[in-house]
Amino acid sequence: MQYKNQNLTHFVKAAGUAAKLSPGGLKTILNFMQKTPALLSDIGNNEDASVYQISRDLALVQTLDFITPIVDSAYHFGAIAAANALSDVFAMGAEVINALNIVGFDTCNHDVNILKELLEGANDKVQECNALVVGGHTIESTELFFGLSVTGKVHPSKFIANNTSKIGDCIILTKPLGTGILSTALKAQMLNQKHLDIMLKNMMELNYKASQIALKFHPSAMSDVTGFGLLGHLKEMLNKNISFEIFQNEILFLEGAKEYFNMGLIPAGAYKNLEFIKELIPDLNEEKLLLCDPQTSGGLLISISEKESLECLKKLEDENIQAKIIAKVVNKQENDIIIS
């Protein structure tokens, strides 16, 4: 579908996953949620999706994600929002069954054709991972938002948690960073066409294939990088026995991201993420803001044994996935995250 400038980002305060509430604030209000033996995922660790056991051989994987427009083309926005929502199921090592549309529609500024194209974009992405859109719900809203409620399935003993990395593992990141920076440049009408095309390709790419490849190498943990930025999601992958050593020079960024960053085109969400992570990295400064950039439809973080990591990386690269080993899991250190 050809990209159309339909001014979607003009009518929203914040774009994509940069509109998420501060992660620190959320932790203080979610401690009332109840546990049950059938709930296999950990409520307290911000898992990517819930895993609920139905039978000895079946667990349902459920997630919900919606975002404000991050691009100005309705079809592309729908596809990106769908890829972003589906990613949570892939990060759990699960298979998507179906999805429901969630729509808040700004009838004052957009006509119904915008909604039609948006839903078409989402439907195409859901079909790409062999699943179905089976319905949804719409309301009128002062700002446009869209996402999916996604249901998947997995064997109860085979889902991949986000905080079970093993000492000695390598951490593979499967997409470059920078969508928050580039989308901020787009909203400021300063993003050139080449960089827009690169950003679109990155965000519309499903994490489905990367997840399928990773599962062949028995990862010890997985997550995806979205609104809390790389450092924020690595924080969620920590446990009491480990720290992460990040190889900063190995991290890939979308073309143009560093230039726009140096121009000051930085989303407010990056500063929120910086505050959230500062307690773990005392010497963290604004030069590291790129590592806090809120991603929309970002890549997977795959924790995998060092022995398997290079072969896994090669398989990902063979599928044109821009993957890199960006960190190593080490014994617990004074600082939980070390940037080298």
From Swiss-Prot:
InterPro entries membership: PurM-like_C_dom (IPR010918), PurM-like_C_sf (IPR036676), PurM-like_N (IPR016188), PurM-like_N_sf (IPR036921), SelD_I (IPR023061), SPS/SelD (IPR004536)
Subunit note: Homodimer.
UniProt GO cellular component terms: cytoplasm
GO BP terms, alphabetized: selenocysteine biosynthetic process
Family classification: Belongs to the selenophosphate synthase 1 family. Class I subfamily.
Gene Ontology MF annotations: ATP binding; magnesium ion binding; selenide, water dikinase activity
Taxonomic superkingdom: Bacteria
Gene: selD
Entry protein name: Selenide, water dikinase
Enzyme class: transferase
